[in-house]
């Protein structure tokens, strides 16, 4: 398996919305490397989870400004990917969540 694939996919995003989308529309959500494009994300998901990817949508999320005492700081910017997989296929990693 390609080591680059594991650098592209940072972590799965498990929220109430992502769980609903997974169950109803076969969509998986990941936090990905900010430099990754849709083609690289598609190849990484197909290699790691052995599924057929139909579509990839990406979103750049700006970090929120937070206050720490009297100072303001900013959380890191990140990139999210919404991956649609072929109907009938499942990813064992997300089952039971």
Swiss-Prot record:
<dbReference type="InterPro" id="IPR012678">
    <property type="entry name" value="Ribosomal_uL23/eL15/eS24_sf"/>
</dbReference>
<dbReference type="GO" id="GO:0006412">
    <property type="term" value="P:translation"/>
</dbReference>
<comment type="similarity">
    <text>Belongs to the universal ribosomal protein uL23 family.</text>
</comment>
<dbReference type="GO" id="GO:0019843">
    <property type="term" value="F:rRNA binding"/>
</dbReference>
<keyword id="KW-0699">rRNA-binding</keyword>
<keyword id="KW-0687">Ribonucleoprotein</keyword>
<dbReference type="Pfam" id="PF00276">
    <property type="entry name" value="Ribosomal_L23"/>
</dbReference>
<dbReference type="InterPro" id="IPR012677">
    <property type="entry name" value="Nucleotide-bd_a/b_plait_sf"/>
</dbReference>
<keyword id="KW-0694">RNA-binding</keyword>
<dbReference type="GO" id="GO:1990904">
    <property type="term" value="C:ribonucleoprotein complex"/>
</dbReference>
<keyword id="KW-0689">Ribosomal protein</keyword>
<protein>
    <recommendedName>
        <fullName>Large ribosomal subunit protein uL23</fullName>
    </recommendedName>
</protein>
<comment type="subunit">
    <text>Part of the 50S ribosomal subunit. Contacts protein L29, and trigger factor when it is bound to the ribosome.</text>
</comment>
<dbReference type="InterPro" id="IPR013025">
    <property type="entry name" value="Ribosomal_uL23-like"/>
</dbReference>
<dbReference type="GO" id="GO:0003735">
    <property type="term" value="F:structural constituent of ribosome"/>
</dbReference>
<dbReference type="GO" id="GO:0005840">
    <property type="term" value="C:ribosome"/>
</dbReference>
<comment type="function">
    <text>One of the early assembly proteins it binds 23S rRNA. One of the proteins that surrounds the polypeptide exit tunnel on the outside of the ribosome. Forms the main docking site for trigger factor binding to the ribosome.</text>
</comment>
